[in-house]
A protein has these predicted regions:
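Active-site-proximal, substrate-binding regions of enzyme catalytic domains
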Residues: 1-107, 115-119, 135
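Acidic, PIN/NYN-like endoribonuclease modules and their adjacent C-terminal/linker elements
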Residues: 2, 115-156
């Protein structure tokens, strides 16, 4: 967030995003909230003040099933090293949960992550990327500006 919209530079962005979260247009995943709250910065303060209209508990049955499928995909896919599975298997890592939820509820994931265009079984990667794994499950990923346009968020 500091790269694109620091709080002191774009307070209107954060207020509009808070409104979209309050009215349920943007869902908040408990694992993502927990990740943010582990920090000690303005984003943590902002998160603590939010009214969340659509809060998703990652332990819901359909999500747990999809989560297992996501991890199984990484485990069985020869383009990934064991390190990719080890990283994504940590419960505090939000990436596989985001994909599991997006599959379960037909959501779009907003991320700055880029696909790994060099994935190959000859040179497996230790890092799974959201866009690559999401695509396997038919989940759409988009950038922040897509979301801003969809929600009608304006700067200035």
């Amino acid at each position: 967030y500091l790269t694109f919209y620091p709080f002191d530079f774009a307070p209107g962005f954060w207020q509009q995003l808070a409104n979209s979260i309050k009215n349920g247009q943007v869902a908040i995943l408990d694992v993502v909230k927990a990740e943010i709250l582990r920090g000690n910065d303005e984003l943590k303060s902002w998160m603590n003040q939010l009214e969340i209209g659509k809060y998703i508990d990652h332990r819901a049955a359909p999500i747990l099933q999809r989560y297992g499928e996501v991890l199984q995909h990484i485990q069985k896919n020869p383009v990934y090293k064991v390190a990719a599975l080890t990283e994504w298997s940590r419960e505090t890592v939000a990436d596989p949960w985001l994909i599991a939820i997006a599959v379960s509820y037909n959501y779009t994931i907003i991320t700055f992550e880029e696909s790994n265009t060099g994935l190959s079984s000859r040179t497996p990667s230790k890092n799974a990327k959201i866009p690559d794994v999401a695509q396997t499950f038919g989940v759409k990923t988009e950038k922040l500006y897509y979301m801003m346009r969809e929600l009608g968020l304006k700067l200035g």
